[in-house]
Design a protein with these regions (language model features):
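Glycine-enriched alpha-helix->loop->beta-strand junction motifs that scaffold or abut catalytic
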Residues: 33-38, 59-62, 80-87, 102-108, ...
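Catalytic beta/alpha-barrel core
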Residues: 16-18, 39-46, 63-71, 84-92, ...
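Glycine-rich phosphate-binding active-site loops on the catalytic face of alpha/beta enzymes
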Residues: 90-96, 129-138, 173-194
């Protein structure tokens, strides 16, 4: 199993599956593997999302898949029970964080204030979700928060697309930008064009690498 933190540092991208028909979820996940980034967050925003995650975990064992938009402890327990490798929260939920830690499951809580970051720091968390990134002040806010929390790394999300995600990664405190643009561009997922999903992803990863080379 890959180390999520390591691959995020390399690619800077965190694919998020917001919605998929049951027969498209696993092929979409497989497309990420083919595109070279075997990580996927499945958002728990509809009734079939948990089943989609379960199907992905069973049918695409080479991907590291987890559950996002987890709001309750019961949801977290169910996701971990079916094999979720990580849990992503929109905000900070102490009971969920502690449950994940007790069950050796990576947890990425949402933190946009110093108070929330204090809680994350106390629990030994190294990566937090910063959502919604633009509405909460973007890079400027993250840089200010990084003063006292220099070791913390931020995964930014919120209406990101294939264009606006890239400038965010110029901030070294941002470990990755999360979004579903690789599924949405050219209506790839809607059209079940899984090869296009792979191409979209490879193109985004290449742009990140090119940007980083120019910075050196």
């Amino acid at each position: 199993m890959i180390n999520i933190k390591d691959i995020l540092k390399i690619t800077g991208i965190f694919p998020i599956l917001a919605y998929a028909e049951p027969d498209s979820a696993a092929p979409a996940a497989k497309a990420l593997v083919e595109g070279g980034l075997p990580v996927l967050e499945v958002l728990m925003r509809d009734e079939q999302a948990m089943n989609n995650l379960k199907r992905i975990l069973l049918e695409v064992p080479e991907i590291t898949a987890g559950a996002g938009t987890i709001l309750t402890l019961d949801q977290a327990k169910e996701a971990i029970d079916i094999g979720a490798k990580f849990i992503v929260l929109p905000g900070y939920h102490e009971k969920i964080v502690e449950y994940c830690i007790d069950h050796d499951t990576l947890v990425v809580p949402g933190c946009v204030t110093a108070a929330e970051l204090m809680q994350a720091y106390e629990h030994g968390i190294e990566i937090v979700k910063f959502f919604p990134v633009f509405q909460m002040g973007g890079i400027e806010t993250i840089q200010m928060l990084s003063g006292p929390f220099g070791s913390m790394r931020f995964m930014v999300t919120g209406n990101l697309n294939g264009e606006n995600f890239l400038p965010l990664l110029r901030c070294d405190k941002i470990i990755a930008a999360g979004g579903d643009w690789m599924f949405q561009e050219q209506d790839a997922l809607k059209n079940r064009d899984f090869d296009q999903i792979s191409r979209n992803l490879r193109n985004s990863v290449m742009r990140v690498q090119n940007m980083r080379c120019l910075k050196k």
